[in-house]
Protein backbone atom coordinates (compact mmCIF):
# COMPACT_ATOMS: atom_id res chain seq x y z
CA UNK A 1 0.00 0.00 0.00
CA UNK A 2 1.43 3.35 -1.07
CA UNK A 3 2.06 6.13 1.47
CA UNK A 4 1.52 9.86 1.03
CA UNK A 5 4.98 10.64 2.39
CA UNK A 6 8.34 8.95 2.07
CA UNK A 7 11.17 8.17 -0.32
CA UNK A 8 10.27 7.74 -4.00
CA UNK A 9 10.80 4.23 -5.38
CA UNK A 10 12.19 3.31 -8.79
CA UNK A 11 8.86 3.40 -10.67
CA UNK A 12 8.06 6.87 -9.29
CA UNK A 13 11.53 8.11 -10.30
CA UNK A 14 10.88 6.87 -13.83
CA UNK A 15 7.59 8.78 -13.79
CA UNK A 16 9.46 11.98 -12.93
CA UNK A 17 11.20 11.70 -16.30
CA UNK A 18 7.94 10.93 -18.09
CA UNK A 19 6.31 13.99 -16.49
CA UNK A 20 9.19 16.35 -17.30
CA UNK A 21 10.12 16.82 -13.64
CA UNK A 22 13.50 15.20 -14.22
CA UNK A 23 15.36 16.24 -17.35
CA UNK A 24 18.47 14.84 -18.99
CA UNK A 25 20.79 15.67 -21.88
CA UNK A 26 20.46 12.09 -23.15
CA UNK A 27 18.52 8.86 -22.64
CA UNK A 28 18.92 7.20 -19.26
CA UNK A 29 21.36 4.34 -18.84
CA UNK A 30 19.62 1.01 -18.38
CA UNK A 31 20.64 0.62 -14.73
CA UNK A 32 20.69 4.30 -13.79
CA UNK A 33 17.51 4.12 -11.70
CA UNK A 34 18.16 2.24 -8.47
CA UNK A 35 15.50 0.97 -5.99
CA UNK A 36 15.36 4.28 -4.10
CA UNK A 37 17.70 6.63 -5.96
CA UNK A 38 18.93 7.85 -9.31
CA UNK A 39 22.58 7.83 -10.36
CA UNK A 40 23.73 11.23 -11.63
CA UNK A 41 25.98 11.47 -14.70
CA UNK A 42 28.82 13.87 -15.41
CA UNK A 43 28.40 16.28 -18.29
CA UNK A 44 30.95 17.02 -21.00
CA UNK A 45 33.05 19.65 -19.17
CA UNK A 46 34.82 20.00 -15.85
CA UNK A 47 35.87 23.35 -14.38
CA UNK A 48 39.03 23.38 -12.30
CA UNK A 49 38.42 26.00 -9.62
CA UNK A 50 40.61 27.73 -7.05
CA UNK A 51 38.51 26.58 -4.12
CA UNK A 52 35.21 25.04 -3.14
CA UNK A 53 32.33 27.47 -2.71
CA UNK A 54 28.69 27.78 -1.68
CA UNK A 55 26.56 29.81 -4.12
CA UNK A 56 24.31 31.30 -1.44
CA UNK A 57 20.91 32.99 -1.87
CA UNK A 58 20.51 34.89 -5.11
CA UNK A 59 23.63 33.48 -6.77
CA UNK A 60 23.96 31.04 -9.66
CA UNK A 61 26.71 28.43 -9.83
CA UNK A 62 27.56 29.53 -13.37
CA UNK A 63 28.29 33.07 -12.16
CA UNK A 64 30.64 31.76 -9.48
CA UNK A 65 32.41 29.57 -12.04
CA UNK A 66 33.09 32.57 -14.25
CA UNK A 67 34.99 34.17 -11.38
CA UNK A 68 36.71 31.13 -9.83
CA UNK A 69 37.57 28.84 -12.74
CA UNK A 70 41.23 28.25 -13.57
CA UNK A 71 40.61 26.25 -16.74
CA UNK A 72 38.05 24.04 -18.48
CA UNK A 73 38.61 20.31 -19.11
CA UNK A 74 36.93 18.37 -21.92
CA UNK A 75 35.51 15.11 -20.55
CA UNK A 76 34.12 13.75 -23.82
CA UNK A 77 37.10 11.39 -24.31
CA UNK A 78 37.99 11.05 -20.63
CA UNK A 79 40.35 13.12 -18.50
CA UNK A 80 42.42 12.78 -15.33
CA UNK A 81 41.30 14.60 -12.19
CA UNK A 82 44.27 15.09 -9.88
CA UNK A 83 44.37 14.67 -6.11
CA UNK A 84 44.19 17.83 -4.04
CA UNK A 85 42.37 19.76 -6.77
CA UNK A 86 38.75 20.92 -6.83
CA UNK A 87 36.57 20.50 -9.90
CA UNK A 88 32.98 21.52 -10.65
CA UNK A 89 31.15 19.47 -13.29
CA UNK A 90 27.68 20.33 -14.65
CA UNK A 91 25.60 17.15 -14.54
CA UNK A 92 23.56 15.70 -17.39
CA UNK A 93 20.43 15.69 -15.23
CA UNK A 94 18.46 18.76 -14.13
CA UNK A 95 15.32 19.19 -12.05
CA UNK A 96 11.88 20.79 -12.08
CA UNK A 97 10.58 19.44 -8.78
CA UNK A 98 6.96 19.70 -7.60
CA UNK A 99 6.39 22.10 -4.73
CA UNK A 100 6.09 19.29 -2.17
CA UNK A 101 9.10 17.26 -3.31
CA UNK A 102 12.69 17.71 -2.10
CA UNK A 103 15.82 15.67 -2.69
CA UNK A 104 19.20 14.82 -1.20
CA UNK A 105 22.40 13.53 -2.74
CA UNK A 106 25.28 11.33 -1.65
CA UNK A 107 28.36 9.78 -3.24
CA UNK A 108 27.86 6.32 -4.71
CA UNK A 109 29.46 3.58 -2.61
CA UNK A 110 32.23 2.99 -5.16
CA UNK A 111 33.01 6.72 -5.13
CA UNK A 112 33.41 6.80 -1.37
CA UNK A 113 35.63 3.73 -1.40
CA UNK A 114 37.99 5.52 -3.79
CA UNK A 115 38.17 8.50 -1.41
CA UNK A 116 36.69 10.83 -4.00
CA UNK A 117 35.09 13.71 -2.14
CA UNK A 118 31.92 14.72 -4.00
CA UNK A 119 28.88 16.85 -3.25
CA UNK A 120 26.02 18.16 -5.34
CA UNK A 121 25.49 21.92 -5.67
CA UNK A 122 22.39 23.77 -6.86
CA UNK A 123 21.81 27.38 -7.82
CA UNK A 124 21.22 29.58 -4.74
CA UNK A 125 22.26 26.68 -2.50
CA UNK A 126 22.89 27.22 1.20
CA UNK A 127 23.73 23.54 1.83
CA UNK A 128 25.63 20.90 -0.12
CA UNK A 129 23.81 17.73 -1.20
CA UNK A 130 20.41 19.22 -0.32
CA UNK A 131 17.88 20.14 -3.01
CA UNK A 132 14.97 22.21 -1.67
CA UNK A 133 11.33 21.40 -2.42
CA UNK A 134 10.21 22.81 -5.76
CA UNK A 135 13.77 23.40 -7.03
CA UNK A 136 13.97 24.15 -10.73
CA UNK A 137 17.38 24.31 -12.35
CA UNK A 138 20.68 22.59 -13.11
CA UNK A 139 22.74 20.32 -10.88
CA UNK A 140 26.51 20.49 -10.45
CA UNK A 141 28.94 18.10 -8.81
CA UNK A 142 31.97 19.23 -6.85
CA UNK A 143 34.73 16.60 -7.15
CA UNK A 144 37.99 16.44 -5.22
CA UNK A 145 40.00 13.18 -5.39
CA UNK A 146 41.80 12.73 -2.08
CA UNK A 147 43.99 9.61 -2.38
CA UNK A 148 44.06 8.42 -6.01
CA UNK A 149 44.00 10.42 -9.24
CA UNK A 150 41.01 9.27 -11.29
CA UNK A 151 39.90 9.14 -14.91
CA UNK A 152 36.33 10.31 -15.51
CA UNK A 153 34.35 11.03 -18.67
CA UNK A 154 30.96 12.28 -19.79
CA UNK A 155 28.42 9.84 -18.39
CA UNK A 156 30.52 8.69 -15.41
CA UNK A 157 28.35 8.20 -12.33
CA UNK A 158 29.88 9.35 -9.04
CA UNK A 159 26.85 10.54 -7.11
CA UNK A 160 23.23 9.59 -6.53
CA UNK A 161 20.06 11.44 -5.61
CA UNK A 162 17.02 10.49 -3.51
CA UNK A 163 13.63 12.15 -3.79
CA UNK A 164 11.19 12.50 -0.90
CA UNK A 165 7.81 13.96 -0.07
CA UNK A 166 7.16 15.13 3.46
CA UNK A 167 8.73 13.68 6.58
CA UNK A 168 9.74 10.03 6.24
CA UNK A 169 12.17 9.44 9.11
CA UNK A 170 11.34 6.68 11.60
CA UNK A 171 11.26 7.64 15.26
CA UNK A 172 13.29 5.82 17.89
CA UNK A 173 10.29 3.72 18.95
CA UNK A 174 9.45 2.89 15.32
CA UNK A 175 13.03 1.75 14.70
CA UNK A 176 12.85 -0.54 17.74
CA UNK A 177 9.50 -1.96 16.59
CA UNK A 178 10.91 -2.59 13.11
CA UNK A 179 13.96 -4.27 14.58
CA UNK A 180 11.74 -6.63 16.56
CA UNK A 181 9.92 -7.75 13.41
CA UNK A 182 12.68 -7.53 10.78
CA UNK A 183 16.04 -7.67 12.65
CA UNK A 184 17.75 -4.54 11.34
CA UNK A 185 21.12 -5.44 12.85
CA UNK A 186 22.42 -8.76 14.17
CA UNK A 187 22.06 -7.79 17.82
CA UNK A 188 19.54 -8.68 20.52
CA UNK A 189 20.08 -5.30 22.18
CA UNK A 190 20.61 -2.70 19.43
CA UNK A 191 21.97 0.67 20.47
CA UNK A 192 19.23 3.03 19.29
CA UNK A 193 19.50 6.74 20.01
CA UNK A 194 18.14 9.74 18.16
CA UNK A 195 16.25 7.41 15.79
CA UNK A 196 19.49 5.83 14.59
CA UNK A 197 20.98 2.38 15.13
CA UNK A 198 24.61 2.50 16.19
CA UNK A 199 27.23 0.75 14.07
CA UNK A 200 30.56 -0.20 15.61
CA UNK A 201 33.92 -1.09 14.11
CA UNK A 202 35.30 -4.62 13.69
CA UNK A 203 39.02 -4.76 14.45
CA UNK A 204 39.31 -8.46 15.31
CA UNK A 205 39.76 -9.31 11.65
CA UNK A 206 38.48 -11.91 9.23
CA UNK A 207 40.00 -15.06 7.80
CA UNK A 208 43.09 -16.93 8.92
CA UNK A 209 45.31 -13.86 8.54
CA UNK A 210 43.09 -11.53 10.60
CA UNK A 211 42.56 -8.92 7.86
CA UNK A 212 40.89 -5.85 9.37
CA UNK A 213 41.05 -3.37 6.50
CA UNK A 214 43.13 -1.46 3.99
CA UNK A 215 45.04 1.82 3.94
CA UNK A 216 45.29 3.76 0.69
CA UNK A 217 48.75 4.21 -0.84
CA UNK A 218 50.06 7.51 -2.10
CA UNK A 219 51.58 8.36 -5.51
CA UNK A 220 49.75 5.58 -7.35
CA UNK A 221 48.64 5.17 -10.93
CA UNK A 222 45.24 6.52 -11.95
CA UNK A 223 41.95 4.69 -11.33
CA UNK A 224 39.41 4.64 -14.16
CA UNK A 225 36.05 5.05 -12.40
CA UNK A 226 34.20 3.22 -15.19
CA UNK A 227 36.33 0.06 -15.33
CA UNK A 228 35.54 -2.90 -13.07
CA UNK A 229 38.19 -5.36 -11.88
CA UNK A 230 40.85 -3.36 -13.73
CA UNK A 231 43.43 -2.75 -11.00
CA UNK A 232 45.50 -4.89 -8.67
CA UNK A 233 44.73 -4.40 -4.99
CA UNK A 234 48.33 -4.15 -3.78
CA UNK A 235 49.25 -1.43 -6.27
CA UNK A 236 46.83 0.88 -4.47
CA UNK A 237 46.21 -0.56 -0.99
CA UNK A 238 48.20 -1.71 2.02
CA UNK A 239 46.39 -4.54 3.87
CA UNK A 240 46.03 -4.13 7.64
CA UNK A 241 45.98 -7.13 9.98
CA UNK A 242 44.97 -7.69 13.58
CA UNK A 243 48.02 -7.92 15.87
CA UNK A 244 46.06 -9.02 18.91
CA UNK A 245 45.45 -5.58 20.41
CA UNK A 246 42.09 -5.10 18.65
CA UNK A 247 42.87 -1.46 17.96
CA UNK A 248 44.12 0.68 15.10
CA UNK A 249 45.91 4.02 15.21
CA UNK A 250 44.52 6.29 12.51
CA UNK A 251 47.23 8.53 11.11
CA UNK A 252 46.22 12.07 10.10
CA UNK A 253 45.26 12.45 6.43
CA UNK A 254 45.43 8.72 5.72
CA UNK A 255 42.45 6.89 4.21
CA UNK A 256 41.19 3.56 5.54
CA UNK A 257 38.65 0.97 4.42
CA UNK A 258 37.25 -0.88 7.44
CA UNK A 259 34.05 -2.81 8.17
CA UNK A 260 31.25 -2.69 10.73
CA UNK A 261 30.94 -5.36 13.39
CA UNK A 262 27.18 -5.56 12.81
CA UNK A 263 25.42 -7.05 9.81
CA UNK A 264 22.88 -4.56 8.47
CA UNK A 265 19.44 -5.26 7.02
CA UNK A 266 17.20 -2.81 5.14
CA UNK A 267 13.69 -4.25 4.59
CA UNK A 268 12.04 -3.63 1.19
CA UNK A 269 9.63 -0.94 2.42
CA UNK A 270 12.41 1.18 3.93
CA UNK A 271 15.59 2.99 2.95
CA UNK A 272 18.49 3.82 5.25
CA UNK A 273 21.30 6.34 5.46
CA UNK A 274 24.51 6.55 7.48
CA UNK A 275 24.35 9.81 9.39
CA UNK A 276 27.41 12.07 9.56
CA UNK A 277 29.64 11.11 12.45
CA UNK A 278 29.31 13.20 15.59
CA UNK A 279 32.63 15.04 16.05
CA UNK A 280 32.03 15.03 19.81
CA UNK A 281 32.60 11.27 19.83
CA UNK A 282 35.87 11.07 17.91
CA UNK A 283 38.33 12.96 15.73
CA UNK A 284 37.61 11.16 12.50
CA UNK A 285 35.14 11.04 9.63
CA UNK A 286 33.33 7.84 8.69
CA UNK A 287 31.52 6.92 5.50
CA UNK A 288 31.29 9.27 2.56
CA UNK A 289 28.64 7.10 0.88
CA UNK A 290 25.61 7.16 3.10
CA UNK A 291 22.70 5.61 1.14
CA UNK A 292 21.56 2.04 1.82
CA UNK A 293 18.86 0.92 -0.62
CA UNK A 294 15.78 -1.21 0.13
CA UNK A 295 16.82 -4.86 0.12
CA UNK A 296 20.37 -4.28 1.38
CA UNK A 297 21.23 -7.42 3.34
CA UNK A 298 17.71 -8.78 2.73
CA UNK A 299 17.35 -12.57 2.44
CA UNK A 300 15.03 -12.40 -0.59
CA UNK A 301 17.67 -10.52 -2.57
CA UNK A 302 20.63 -12.71 -1.71
CA UNK A 303 21.78 -11.23 1.59
CA UNK A 304 21.75 -12.53 5.12
CA UNK A 305 22.52 -9.16 6.58
CA UNK A 306 25.46 -7.32 5.03
CA UNK A 307 28.17 -5.59 7.01
CA UNK A 308 28.67 -1.92 6.24
CA UNK A 309 31.99 -1.07 4.64
CA UNK A 310 33.30 2.12 6.23
CA UNK A 311 35.48 4.79 4.68
CA UNK A 312 37.46 6.29 7.55
CA UNK A 313 39.72 9.33 7.64
CA UNK A 314 41.33 10.89 10.72
CA UNK A 315 41.56 14.65 11.06
CA UNK A 316 44.29 16.75 12.68
CA UNK A 317 45.63 14.28 15.23
CA UNK A 318 46.40 10.53 15.41
CA UNK A 319 43.42 8.69 16.87
CA UNK A 320 43.17 5.22 18.41
CA UNK A 321 40.17 3.29 17.13
CA UNK A 322 39.18 0.29 19.27
CA UNK A 323 37.19 -2.83 18.42
CA UNK A 324 33.49 -2.29 19.10
CA UNK A 325 33.75 1.51 19.16
CA UNK A 326 30.66 3.23 17.76
CA UNK A 327 31.53 4.96 14.49
CA UNK A 328 28.18 6.01 13.06
CA UNK A 329 24.41 5.60 13.09
CA UNK A 330 22.02 4.22 10.52
CA UNK A 331 18.70 6.04 10.24
CA UNK A 332 15.70 4.55 8.46
CA UNK A 333 13.04 6.22 6.31
CA UNK A 334 9.75 4.98 4.89
CA UNK A 335 9.50 4.26 1.18
CA UNK A 336 6.32 5.58 -0.43
CA UNK A 337 5.89 2.12 -1.99
CA UNK A 338 7.87 -1.09 -2.43
CA UNK A 339 10.43 -0.77 -5.24
CA UNK A 340 10.04 -3.02 -8.26
CA UNK A 341 13.70 -3.94 -7.90
CA UNK A 342 15.55 -4.60 -4.65
CA UNK A 343 19.23 -4.07 -3.92
CA UNK A 344 21.05 -7.19 -5.11
CA UNK A 345 18.37 -8.30 -7.58
CA UNK A 346 19.68 -7.33 -11.01
CA UNK A 347 19.86 -3.57 -10.41
CA UNK A 348 23.59 -3.11 -10.74
CA UNK A 349 24.33 -3.81 -7.07
CA UNK A 350 27.97 -4.68 -6.50
CA UNK A 351 28.10 -5.20 -2.76
CA UNK A 352 25.23 -7.47 -1.63
CA UNK A 353 26.20 -9.97 1.11
CA UNK A 354 29.45 -8.08 1.51
CA UNK A 355 32.01 -8.30 4.24
CA UNK A 356 35.21 -6.28 4.00
CA UNK A 357 35.27 -5.31 0.34
CA UNK A 358 37.10 -2.73 -1.74
CA UNK A 359 35.35 -0.95 -4.60
CA UNK A 360 34.43 -2.76 -7.80
CA UNK A 361 37.51 -1.34 -9.57
CA UNK A 362 39.94 -3.76 -7.89
CA UNK A 363 40.57 -7.43 -8.63
CA UNK A 364 40.36 -10.02 -5.88
Task: Please describe what each predicted stretch is.
Residues 1-364:
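DUTPase catalytic domain/fold
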Amino acid sequence: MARDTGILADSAIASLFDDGRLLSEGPLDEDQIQPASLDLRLGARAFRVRASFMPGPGHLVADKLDRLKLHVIDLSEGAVLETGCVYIVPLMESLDLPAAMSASANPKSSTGRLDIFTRVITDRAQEFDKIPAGYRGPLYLEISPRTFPVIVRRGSRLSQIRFRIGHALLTESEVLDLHRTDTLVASDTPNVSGAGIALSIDLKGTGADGLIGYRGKHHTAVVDVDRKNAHGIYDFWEPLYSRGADELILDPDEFYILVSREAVHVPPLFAAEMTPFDPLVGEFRVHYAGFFDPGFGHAQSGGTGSRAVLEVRSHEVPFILEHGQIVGRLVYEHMMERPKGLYGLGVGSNYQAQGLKLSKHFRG
